[in-house]
Amino acid sequence: MTQAKYTPEQIIAKLQAHPKFGSQIKPITKHQSAIISSGLEPAVVIAGAGSGKTETMSNRVLYLVANGFATPDQILGLTFTRKAAGELSIRIRKRLRQLSQLPEFKHITSTSTAVTTYHSYAGKLLSEHAIRYGIDADAEPLGEAAIWQIASDVVRNWSDDSYRNDSAVSTVIKDLLGLSKLMLEHQVKASDIEAIGNEMLEKLQLLAGSTNEDTRAVARAMRQRNSLLPMVEAFMERRKAAGELSFDDQMSLAADIAQNFEDVGTLERGKYKVVLLDEYQDTSQSQVRMLSDRKSKRLNSSQTCALPI
């Protein structure tokens, strides 16, 4: 990144001097200034609730735009909730409009930045490239009630004689939904779960206390989980083939697309010079994969990634 013409403090001072809205502009701390003026390499910011994350991210955008490092439409902001996305988008637009009223920044005519949720971005990525997998991803993601109904239909019509489970139908549906969600989230195949389950069952049988009630309960649960796996696979394949996708499905498929097709990453990097991530969850394997560089397996070093947590 080239030398900045304006420091964060100078930009804030110019805004504070404006007679109409100057009183709305809060001063920044040294720590916030360092975050706002950081380079274009990935960076992690640890900040608690109420510490001024939204304002700092907004000022980061002002700094980049004021110094010509990026235009508003080259900045992508991702948040965890729609509420947070709305708040950040409104704050950025407001600050950019205020900046454009200063004589030095009259040339700034656009205040449009791409601020959305992680799931919405995944849905957009999937809709643009779903044809690569031959699926229909134009429909809105299914809600919990619709997903539950499909799971109920799969469970009630399951006819595999090898399936063994004495639980109530409602419990099986709940287990089916929970296991499929975890498999999508952590990108685990049914065959891998079954292999590990069988290995653990063998080890349980070798334990000296393998006949006690606790050990038998664990073994029983693992056998039931393994017997549930074919049903989970059928549930997931049915929805994928019909385009009946949940938010978790969209995130998982978007991650697959980002990882398996190098040109997708190239296209996205061409759109956005800067990426700001709010409440980034590195415990979500799909989210990590979607936002990672396919070659280096890390967040793209050509972009700025501010990660307030």
What are these regions (language model features)?
Residues 295-301, 307:
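Conserved small/polar residues in nucleotide/adenosyl-binding loops
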Residues 1-135, 263-266, 275, 285:
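P-loop NTPase Walker
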